[in-house]
């Protein structure tokens, strides 16, 4: 059994779903710190966005919290990809729709 298979078995035994295990496997294969997103409260979509941001070396760690929905994490990642100051909207108390609105406004201001 390979090291990757052993790690996946560990997460399978802890109740992670097939899609979550796929994200874990992709993270292991890309050599990122999977510990940032292998928390039980993250669904596969949140894990996907966190994994992709880690692979791009974006500073997602402060926002890798299960208090955010996957759509909120998505908006934070989109902002980080554009080099925006996501602290303006990175709050679990702000809906993802409002986050999107703020992010788009920040993008517009950066393009002026």
Please tell me what each predicted stretch does.
Residues 1-112:
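General marker for long, soluble alpha-helical cores
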């Amino acid at each position: 059994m390979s090291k990757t298979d052993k790690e996946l078995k560990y997460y399978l035994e802890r109740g992670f779903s097939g899609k979550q295990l796929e994200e874990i496997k992709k993270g292991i294969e890309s050599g990122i710190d999977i510990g940032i997103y292998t928390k039980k409260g993250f669904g596969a979509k949140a894990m996907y966005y966190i994994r992709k941001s880690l692979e791009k070396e974006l500073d997602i760690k402060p926002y890798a919290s299960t208090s955010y929905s996957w759509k909120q994490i998505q908006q934070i990642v989109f902002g980080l990809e554009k080099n925006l100051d996501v602290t303006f909207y990175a709050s679990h108390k702000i809906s993802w729709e409002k986050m999107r609105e703020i992010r788009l406004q920040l993008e517009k201001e950066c393009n002026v």
